[in-house]
Every structure is written in C-alpha cells, then in structure tokens.
Amino acid sequence: LWGPKVMIINGRAGSGGDLMPYLFRAKGVGPLVGTNTWGRLVGTWDTPPLIDGGSFVAPRGGFYDVNGEWAVEATGVAPDIEVRNNPAEVLAGADPQLEAAVAEALRLLETEGIELMAEPEAPVRYRRPGGGR
C-alpha cells in the first residue's frame, strides 16, 4: 500500500478496463504506462429474448465525467508513458511495458520516497471481568 503506484494499460482493456485507469489518473494515484485503452465504456441492457431462444445486448448508456463531458467512449484512456510490446520481444520472454512500469515505480520511489503514516493505537476488542484489560 505504501510507495508509488503505476498502472499498465493497453488496447485489450475495455469497459472496466477503461474506467479503472481513468479513475486512477483522476485521483492522481500514479502514472499510466503502456498503450491507449480500447475505449468502449458503455452500459448495456438485455433485450427481450428472440423467437429462436437467442438474445443480444445493445449499448444504451454512456459515461460522462464530473464536468458533464462525455469521456472515454471511442477514445479510450491514453498512457502517460507510451510503451508498446513488440510481439517478437514478448515471445522471447521480454515485457517492455512491465519493465517500463517497474523502472518508473523505482524512479518515483527514489525521487519521492515513502511517507509512512504512524500506526494507530491498537483497539480494545474485549474487556476482562472486573474492568481489567
């Protein structure tokens, strides 16, 4: 829980995978590393069943931000640090996005450090008969 946080994102993330990095950035938790998210953050509702027993869903709701502006849908969330994973490198065992995210977390750790909160006094969860602890 302590120390810098970095989130890896890419185009394989949509829906909640779009919303989470959006909120991560909005709350100032830390930088986003990778590539743009997919950009599909809509609400869907089921429709009545089809005569053959099949079904489908249709998008009916969008996402707008605290300023009342439509956000994320069709644009996704862009990274703060763009790093692409080359398939040949990944097949060879490398993970450039992970490596960049770890490097950024270590850089933030060195430049910003960690400020630990004081531990609160332990709660009293029981009382002995006669009022003793």
Question: What is each residue range found by the language model?
Answer:
Residues 1-133:
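C-terminal "post-core" interaction segments
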